[in-house]
Amino acid sequence: MVGEFEIKDEDLAGRIGIIETKSGKLETPVFFPVINPFKSEISIKDIENLGFKNLITNAYLIKKITNTKIQDIHSFLQFNGVIMTDSGAYQILQYGNIEVTNREIVEYERDINTDIAVYLDLPTGDTNSRDEAINSVKITLERAKEIEDIVKNDSERIWVHPIQGGRFLDLVEYSAIEADKNEAFKMLALGSPTVVMEKYDYSLLIDMVFIAKSNVSRGKPFHLFGGGLPHIMPLVIALGVDSFDSASYILYARDNRYITRSRVYRLEELEYFPCSCPICLKYTPKELLELPKEERTKLLALHNLYVIKEELNAIKQAIREGRLFEYIQEKAYSHPAVYSAFKKILKYKDYLEKYDPRVKGNIRGIFLFDLKSLNRPEIVRHYNFLDRINKNNDKAIIICEKRENILKKVKNNENVDIYLFNPFYGLIPINLIEVYPYFQTEYPEEIDEDVLRYIESKIVEFVRSKGYTKIDFIGCEKYLSHINSIGAFFS
């Protein structure tokens, strides 16, 4: 059925899913290249040949420029894949107004037989005026009600309800809650992030996505308008974004900007291409610069699309393997703005833990590196577990030696609770040492001091809260610098 969304795999709050449309199934996370059919630097066939089975175009511009009745958008674009149409809201953001009503453009999108359609919302944009933001939320919600009769009677399309509010997070929350209530709309989308992303204000973007996602149903696919840079994609996918659209690939190409999975370069800055796509294998940066403008733009645009597709595939693989946290941790060091976004995500670790699957089909080892790793769901879950357990005895032994030596140490110890020390999990009850994820965890040989200090504090907090009267430590001098004082406190 059109609009059905089946989740196939999950990691953190991100997921791989299948959206059912009348023109076929879409696997998410998915990127919709923005297409302007009236500019020919790169053809739809070129994009299709890269493996893209979907695109987005502007219904308002097509209506305005053609000035004729189009029977079918697929025939007009000569594209049989999934077509999403925007309504002209971006033009409102740019120019302040457009010459079409909400109902007119919605009827037009229906009549040209698009697959996924957006009604004419009013973008909040990057305004600092709360009154303007309130007005954009109010009008966006009103316009959804205005065309609800069309949407409810249209079973062939997925209709998208935008969420507005901009930098005013309480308005984003209200807009998200109200949008989610409207069951006629099978897809939700966060509007107005384009300017935020252009300014590299990724920390605010993370807040906006989190607030929106945490207040809507997990059963509806969630779209991010304007999300076209690979280095931010995995972070918002980790929060639950399922699809993106952007013209960045062509806009950047026109400006000689070269997208990589970690950052954006100006073509003039490069001596070597850090990529092995067909374009980068054939040309050097110098050779590409010497080509005519139109040809260079096309080739750069194709490269940029290759990179976006490659990034999405890497993210999906990370989700499959349960390594999305490790992946975004690695991505964080690509740019200071991305690092700020990663730090902001860590503040939402309880949200990530809530939706992260406890165990996946193929159990894989997890990698822990530094203090940031303590925010991944497995660690959060472990400390929540420690909070819930009760002591069985008044005395406890904490063993810091290698696993293979543990059984010898505890053989004759009865009437005592025994824990294995781990520099990231803190304390692991002895009967769980071979349970996932403890036995499947890898970490550096040398542990950062800030990690050890944090773990020491967690151990003190744990033994105090459980009411142990005596604690013995075995082989812990290497890890716990204040071990003597800790032991004395509980002896």
UniProtKB/Swiss-Prot annotation:
This protein's UniProt keywords: Glycosyltransferase, Metal-binding, Transferase, tRNA processing, Zinc
Catalyzed reactions per annotation: guanosine(15) in tRNA + 7-cyano-7-deazaguanine = 7-cyano-7-carbaguanosine(15) in tRNA + guanine
Binding site for substrate: D121
Cofactor(s) needed for function: Zn(2+)
Active site location: D86
EC code: 2.4.2.48
Pathway: tRNA modification; archaeosine-tRNA biosynthesis
Role according to the record: Exchanges the guanine residue with 7-cyano-7-deazaguanine (preQ0) at position 15 in the dihydrouridine loop (D-loop) of archaeal tRNAs.
InterPro entries tied to this protein: ArchSynthase1/Queuine_TRR, TGT-like_sf, TgtA, tRNA_ribo_trans-like
Keyword Metal-binding: yes
Cofactor note: Binds 1 zinc ion per subunit.
Keyword presence, Transferase: yes
Pfam families: TGT
Family membership: Belongs to the archaeosine tRNA-ribosyltransferase family.
Signal peptide: none
Protein name in UniProt: tRNA-guanine(15) transglycosylase
